[in-house]
C-alpha cells in the first residue's frame, strides 16, 4: 500500500515542481537569434522631436552579426513602412559585433553608420524595420504598434 500511495505523491510533487519551473522561466531566457539580424531599435529619439541633427542621430537601428565570421554588408538595405531605404556602403561587421544605423548626419565610424537624413524615419506610433539582403531576400523584420519608451528589442 505504501508504494501505491508514494508513487502518485511523488509524481504530483514532480509535476508541481516542473510546472513552477516553467512558470518561473523569464521571457529573456529565449535563445538569441542567429545570423545577421535586427537588434535594438530606438525609434523615438529621447526628448522632444526637434529635427535637430542631435535628435536625428539619437534615432537608430542596430544590426547584429551573431555568426563566427565577419560579414560584408555592402548592398544590404534597411527599410521602413513608408519606403525610406538605407543602403549599406562597403562595411564589414565583425563576428559577434553590432553596428548602429543612425538617422542623422555624421561620418561613418567603427560600429556607427549614418543615413544622413534631415528628417525622422521611424514612426513613433507604429512602423516596421526590414533588413534586406542585396539579392532582395528579406533577412529579418521587426515591428511595433505604439510608443513604449521609444525602443524595441528585436532579438
Where do the protein language model's features map onto the residues?
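Short Gly/aromatic-enriched secondary-structure transition segments
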Residues: 74-80
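Short, exposed beta-strand-loop hairpins at the edges of beta-sheets
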Residues: 130-145
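Short, surface-exposed ligand- or partner-binding patches at beta-edge/loop junctions that are enriched
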Residues: 114-133
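Acidic glycine-/aspartate-rich tracts in secreted/extracellular proteins
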Residues: 66-69, 104-108, 134-138
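Hydrophobic beta-strand signal
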Residues: 62, 79, 100-102
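Intrinsically disordered, low-complexity Pro/Gly/Ser/Thr-rich segments with frequent PxxP/GP/PP motifs
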Residues: 83-116
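A structural motif detector for short, solvent-exposed N-terminal "entry" segments of globular domains
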Residues: 2-11, 17-74, 120-124, 141-155
